[in-house]
Amino acid sequence: VILGFESFETANAYGQALGEQDGILKKLITTVEAPAPQTYFLRHRSLIPEGVSIAAVTIAPHALDAFYAFTSAFKAKVLLDTSRASAETMKGLPPNYELAWNHTTLRALRVDPAITYLQVRYGDEGALARAHRILAKYREELIGHHEFIRFNGRVEFAGLTLVRFTSEDRLNEIISDHEKMGAFVFNPHRYTLEEGGMKQTDAIQLAFKRENDPKGLLNPGKMIAFEDPNFDFASGQSYLFPGLEARAAAAQG
């Protein structure tokens, strides 16, 4: 099912509420901010009005009645229900899971090769409000995309925000500002475990690496702590594996 909402905020409020309905069996809750669905979901253009943000969900057939009873309390418009749509409507349409997670990013890239993305966690308390504040601040550069998940028994969401890329410096500014505003970015533009994740040494990972790959033959340069135990993660500088320094210098001319 694809539902339309007047704003990304209302789509997310719905996504959070639907995720918390344990009696409605579902597999996917994805929210995407306008104008991304209209611009990047090419096969769905005739179904999604301009300015409408969407929630793409996958609901078990036996739970559809309960799903619609729940959804009736929200200002949501049903744009597509594959259980009711005609064969003509369904012709050529991908399943909802191909609009979700990094499929969303890939569809955007097919239309605009300058698009990139960030992986964001917005904390616990006030996560939705925090996400909306960040998106509002960077309205010309960011487009919201959230995936609702169950984590440690709680319904949360992950941000796979679409970014209109202009420069590496600007991207780093946006990442830094996310963190100043209380969000945490798992940076997909870094190749090391630490920079792409928790930005600190994982002692268990490091011990496992030393035990099983003492000479560092597997994925060299992937773990900063193995190559440079004294690296300062607070410096704001990207780590460059020594074997790549010459190549990087050559690329910069």
Task: Enumerate the language-model features and the residues they cover.
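A conserved active-site cap/scaffold subdomain adjacent to cofactor or substrate pockets
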Residues: 1-30, 37-80
